[in-house]
Curated annotation (Swiss-Prot):
Entry keyword Membrane: yes
Family statement drawn from the similarity comment of this UniProt entry: In the C-terminal section; belongs to the glycosyltransferase 49 family. In the N-terminal section; belongs to the glycosyltransferase 8 family.
Catalytic activity: 3-O-[beta-D-GlcA-(1->3)-beta-D-Xyl-(1->4)-Rib-ol-P-Rib-ol-P-3-beta-D-GalNAc-(1->3)-beta-D-GlcNAc-(1->4)-(O-6-P-alpha-D-Man)]-Thr-[protein] + UDP-alpha-D-xylose = 3-O-[alpha-D-Xyl-(1->3)-beta-D-GlcA-(1->4)-beta-D-Xyl-(1->4)-Rib-ol-P-Rib-ol-P-3-beta-D-GalNAc-(1->3)-beta-D-GlcNAc-(1->4)-(O-6-P-alpha-D-Man)]-Thr-[protein] + UDP + H(+); 3-O-{(1->[3)-alpha-D-Xyl-(1->3)-beta-D-GlcA-(1->](n)-4)-beta-D-Xyl-(1->4)-Rib-ol-P-Rib-ol-P-3-beta-D-GalNAc-(1->3)-beta-D-GlcNAc-(1->4)-O-6-P-alpha-D-Man}-L-Thr-[protein] + UDP-alpha-D-glucuronate = 3-O-{beta-D-GlcA-(1->[3)-alpha-D-Xyl-(1->3)-beta-D-GlcA-(1->](n)-4)-beta-D-Xyl-(1->4)-Rib-ol-P-Rib-ol-P-3-beta-D-GalNAc-(1->3)-beta-D-GlcNAc-(1->4)-O-6-P-alpha-D-Man}-L-Thr-[protein] + UDP + H(+); 3-O-{beta-D-GlcA-(1->[3)-alpha-D-Xyl-(1->3)-beta-D-GlcA-(1->](n)-4)-beta-D-Xyl-(1->4)-Rib-ol-P-Rib-ol-P-3-beta-D-GalNAc-(1->3)-beta-D-GlcNAc-(1->4)-O-6-P-alpha-D-Man}-L-Thr-[protein] + UDP-alpha-D-xylose = 3-O-{(1->[3)-alpha-D-Xyl-(1->3)-beta-D-GlcA-(1->](n+1)-4)-beta-D-Xyl-(1->4)-Rib-ol-P-Rib-ol-P-3-beta-D-GalNAc-(1->3)-beta-D-GlcNAc-(1->4)-O-6-P-alpha-D-Man}-L-Thr-[protein] + UDP + H(+)
Name of this chain's protein: Xylosyl- and glucuronyltransferase LARGE2
Enzyme Commission number, as recorded: 2.4.-.-, 2.4.2.-, 2.4.1.-
Membrane topology: Single-pass type II membrane protein
């Protein structure tokens, strides 16, 4: 006999089993879609919504209450519906995915980096980036990718200037100018053997693995060659304002911020002749394109609708001024690509803009160094120098007391040259660029430096990705800095515990464009007249190929945060006599500048020659092709001294200028100075670097290097600095 209550329990269990079976029969299709979704996530965009599914049909077009108002193409046959049909399989694990981007100028280059970060964060496949760039963007991005050393990423560059004649005949009102038309010529510009490519605008951000987008090529019919998301505004309906006359489009038209191109089919179909004929015909009645290449793509698709494959709306969520994208993202559980296609970019008016802005800022400020780590293994050519670097790192001993120094020397820092818009100075035979380096805690020096030095500057900044954005806002908010287009800022991204001072100097020095450079430090303010005086002195002394010399600019310092900066040598000497100024490091490290002979400088009327002496580290003006700084010296100590030793070994004259001066302003000691003062191990490691430096000096200069041996053997005093 069953215990009381057992029949009731068995009945309940049977009822539950029946309900589960019924649920499986009802929702099995949805579960099947989840299993077939590329990338393995629940929520395939091609499935009808179940309880846990996104409400985005296979083409991304929203129906019923969620449909776009006034949608002229809402018929069931217009949307490429698969009704939960088979989802495209993901591409093979190691298939190379091709991505094309048109990029021109400084600002667009910064946008590309954020886009690439978002792609790299999610990607599981090797990538080949095809970048159509102007000279400015190529210089920036070539340097960046070379120093980034991301595994399984290839980059090819194409000269935008060579493509301009193919589109320059098209009048265009869009802010992107001619570059906004260059996607039209990609089938002929990219290699003939390239059959498929994803084309992206610089203002898109990925929220998913790009291989899922690549997988949508499998949806193409035999005749389709262009994959696009429908335009998420009423622009092509012509009802945004009175007398608005857009280019012809199929229904709402399509947005070209994200494109899948079957290049092979477009070439076979005669794409170049097709878009040219269409554009010429439409321009007979329309004055210009308003949305650049997008207008012409839409006009061609209107005439040849069989070319287009509609993509789900989540692959191009458009945040334009008149966007209706909310109808897409409010129904979707898994957005794929965010597109800031308003000229206002992050300042566009949208009630959900904070959500999208924060998502964008995540990648804008994301540490790009973390993307160097390869989380998947695919056979690919390693970045140049990567194998040698890994071998050198593998030989380091983590138990070595100087391990930090050794590791920092081998670190390859990401470098973003000309981070902000920069206009190179017009060529002048005796022009001088001020070269310096700084970190975030010295930004406050920039405005004063710009007031003191009216000439070109090349400055290297050691920043994190997040600090780089703070720096950008700092410059934009400063009328003094924003007005100076002749100041080139180069961001070297922070990595490692020690300050790579000489690597920073070399970056700034390499980017100087004038024949001569003034090698300074950020804590110094030069005399107001120094720029003009240096150019005149270079000409008078006949420097250049006839005479190899380093012009010494005498250095002074003040311990006061506020003082009246001298406008002449006479005023400076008065402040020196009054005790307001001192010769630089007179109290702590007089050997560093004693050879300048300040007593002689007081009376000098003409340049005079001085001899090198141990620990001499003056600030000098030299030709741009001077020896580079020794990058082994990181942190504090001997970084400038070693450079002056090299100049002397290469027989540079040291000439002190009688009317030149620069003044050091007080500041809190850096972390590296503090470590130098407090740590005997730090000083021992510095001595080891000095010994290695002399060995290399002897190999290069032979017996002539013996004169520097006593200086190199002197121990470093912890009181220095």
């Amino acid at each position: 006999m069953l215990p009381r209550g057992r029949p009731r329990a068995l009945g309940a269990a049977a009822l539950l089993l029946l309900l589960l079976l019924l649920g499986f029969l009802l929702f099995g299709g949805d579960l099947g879609c989840e299993r077939r979704e590329p990338g393995g996530r629940a929520g395939a965009p091609g499935c009808f919504p179940g309880p846990l599914m996104p409400r985005v049909p296979p083409d991304g077009r929203l129906r019923r209450a969620a449909a776009l108002d006034g949608d002229p193409g809402a018929g069931p046959g217009d949307h490429n519906r698969s009704d939960c049909g088979p989802q495209p399989p993901p591409p093979p694990k190691c298939e190379l995915l091709h991505v094309a981007i048109v990029c021109a100028g400084h600002n667009s280059s910064r946008d590309v980096i954020t886009l690439v970060k978002s792609m790299l964060f999610y990607r599981k496949n090797p990538l080949h980036l095809h970048l159509v760039t102007d000279a400015v963007a190529r210089n920036i991005l070539e340097t960046l990718f070379h120093t980034w050393m991301v595994p399984a990423v290839r980059v090819s560059f194409y000269h935008a200037d060579q493509l301009k004649p193919q589109v320059s005949w098209i009048p265009n009102k869009h802010y992107s100018g001619l570059y906004g038309l260059m996607k039209l010529v990609l089938p002929s510009a990219l290699p003939a053997e390239l059959a498929r490519v994803i084309v992206l605008d610089t203002d898109v951000t990925f929220a998913s693995d790009i291989s899922e987008l690549w997988a949508l090529f499998a949806h193409f019919s035999d005749t389709q060659a262009i994959g696009l998301v429908e335009n998420q505004s009423d622009w092509y309906l012509g009802n945004l304002w009175k007398n608005h006359r857009p280019w012809p489009a199929l229904g709402r038209g399509f947005n070209t911020g994200v494109i899948l191109l079957r290049l092979d089919r477009l070439r076979q179909a005669g794409w170049e002749q097709m878009w040219r004929l269409t554009a010429r015909r439409e321009l007979l009645s329309l004055p210009a394109t308003s949305l650049a290449d997008q207008d012409i793509f839409n006009a061609v698709i209107k005439e040849h609708p069989g070319l287009v494959q509609r993509l789900p709306c989540v692959w191009n969520v458009q945040l334009s001024d008149h966007t209706l994208a909310e109808r897409c993202y409010s129904e979707a559980s898994d957005l794929k690509v965010i597109h800031w296609n308003s000229p206002k970019k992050l300042r566009v008016k949208n009630k959900h803009v904070e959500f999208f802005r924060n998502f964008y800022l995540t990648f804008l400020e994301y540490d790009g160094n973390l993307l160097r780590r390869e989380l998947f293994v695919c056979p690919s050519q390693p970045p140049p120098g990567a194998e040698q670097l890994q071998q050198a790192l593998a030989q380091l001993d983590e138990e070595d007391p100087c391990f930090e120094f050794r590791q920092q020397q081998l670190t390859v820092h990401r470098v973003h040259v000309t981070f902000l818009p920069h206009e190179p100075p017009p060529p002048r035979p005796h022009d001088v660029t001020l070269v310096a380096q700084l970190s975030m805690d010295r930004l406050q020096m920039l405005e004063a430096l710009c007031r003191h030095w009216p000439g070109p500057m090349s400055l290297a900044l050691y920043l994190t990705d997040a600090e780089a954005q703070q720096f950008l806002h700092f410059v934009e908010a400063s009328p003094v800095l924003a007005a100076r287009q002749d100041v080139a800022y180069h961001v070297v991204y922070r990595e490692g515990p020690l300050y790579p001072v000489n690597q920073l100097r070399n970056v700034a020095l390499a980017q100087a464009l004038t024949p001569y450079v003034f090698l300074s430090d950020i804590d110094f303010l030069p005399a107001y007249s120094l720029y003009d005086y240096l150019r005149a002195s270079i000409e008078q002394l006949g420097l250049g190929s006839r005479r190899k010399a380093a012009l010494v600019v005498p250095a002074f310092e003040t311990l006061r945060y506020r003082f009246s900066f001298p406008h002449s040598k006479v005023e400076l000497l008065a402040l020196l006599d009054a005790g307001t100024l001192y010769t630089f490091r007179y109290h702590e490290w007089p050997r560093g500048h004693a050879p300048t002979d300040y007593a002689r400088w007081r009376e000098a009327q003409a340049p005079y020659r001085v001899q090198w002496a141990a620990n001499y580290e003056p600030y000098v003006v030299v030709p741009r092709d001077c020896p580079r700084y020794d990058p082994r010296f990181v942190g504090f100590g001997w970084n400038k001294v070693a450079h002056i030793v090299e100049l002397d070994a290469q027989e540079y004259e040291l000439l002190v200028l009688p009317e030149a001066f620069t003044i050091h302003l007080p500041h809190a000691p850096s972390l590296d100075i503090s470590r130098f003062r407090s740590s005997p191990t730090y000083r021992d490691c510095l001595q080891a670097l000095k010994d290695e430096f002399h060995q290399d000096l002897s190999r290069h200069h032979g017996a002539a290097a013996l004169k520097y041996l006593p200086a190199l053997q002197q121990p470093q005093s912890p009181a220095r600095g």
